[in-house]
Each structure stands twice: as structure tokens, then as C-alpha cells.
Amino acid sequence: MAHKKGAGSTKNGRDSNAKRLGVKRFGGETVKAGSILIRQRGMKFKPGVNVGYGKDFTLFALIDGTVKFDYKDAQHKRVNIITQ
């Protein structure tokens, strides 16, 4: 039996908690004002019409309406809220 744990074994065994990032409301869904649309790191998706963003880059609806995704240009995705 070894009297030592082996090199590095006590330095391992940790992992961070999942951050639950991603799209929370998809295109065509009806949302209320204040609903979180996307949680992200950085500006992967840009806020469009009637969409605000928080200090952690969370996109949220400013008014009641329907979610619509489009492209601002070739590489920038944008989220809009369209009124009924």
C-alpha cells in the first residue's frame, strides 16, 4: 500500500458549475416584456428592435410581442421583438 496519494491526485477533482447559457426563447415564440431571450458571454447575438441587454450581455424583451431572429450582416445575428 502506498503511503502517499500519488502525484497530483489531491490537486484534481474540481469542476465549475454549468452556467445555463443559451437561447431561452426561440423564433416565433410569444413573449412578455422583461422575458429573458438569450443568456450569453459577449455579444454573440446583438439586440435588435424592442430588445435590451444587461451588463452580463443577457438579451431581454422590452415589449410584449413575437421573437424574430435575423442577420445584421453576414456574421452578426440579431434578435427582434415584433408586435402583433
Swiss-Prot record:
Any one Gene Ontology cellular component term annotated for this protein: chloroplast
Signal peptide extent: none
Residue ranges of the region described as Disordered: 1-23
Cellular compartments annotated: Plastid, Chloroplast
Superkingdom of the source species: Eukaryota
Primary location class: plastid
Protein family according to the UniProt entry: Belongs to the bacterial ribosomal protein bL27 family.
Protein name as annotated: Large ribosomal subunit protein bL27c
Organism: Thalassiosira pseudonana
